[in-house]
A protein has these predicted regions:
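Charged, flexible cofactor/metal-binding loops and thiol motifs
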Residues: 48-134
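P-loop NTP-binding/switch modules centered on Walker-like glycine-rich loops
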Residues: 1-76
Length: 134
């Protein structure tokens, strides 16, 4: 009910929100665009629908799969996409891709390559060097 009221006020007052959450299904409700952050860096950014329907970073994919959605069959994805290990200490951020210690797609180059946002299309970017395989 609170989310409904926030959306109503957003429309009536033509407001923008900075909405911080791990539940991307609620972010999609408010947002035209979504930026996903991991350990203080944006790892994926794009149109809300595209981020939810076609995630191109393993962390984004894991966040989406963590929220069961029976209508799309996402209830079982979390079993297929586990996140390994523990969250690294923010004062000792891993080299290369910040997500590589927990990523099931990680390869050796992920430990050594500083990831930058790369264009997937004109409005969607990912910091994963293997975004084509996700």
């Amino acid at each position: 009910e609170i989310l409904y009221m926030m959306k109503e006020v957003q429309i009536q007052k033509q407001l923008s929100y900075i909405y911080i959450t791990h539940d991307l299904s609620t972010a999609k409700y408010f947002a035209d665009r979504i930026a996903v952050m991991y350990l203080g860096s944006i790892v994926e950014i794009g149109e809300a629908n595209e981020i939810i329907e076609n995630p191109k970073h393993p962390y984004t994919k894991a966040l989406i799969s963590a929220v069961p959605d029976a209508s799309t069959g996402r209830a079982n994805i979390i079993k297929e996409l586990p996140i390994k290990g523990e969250i690294p200490n923010a004062s000792n951020i891993p080299t290369g891709c910040r997500f590589h210690p927990r990523c099931i797609y990680a390869k050796n180059e992920c430990q050594n390559t500083e990831t930058m946002l790369k264009d997937i299309n004109s409005s969607h970017k990912s910091a994963c060097i293997f975004f084509n395989n996700i």
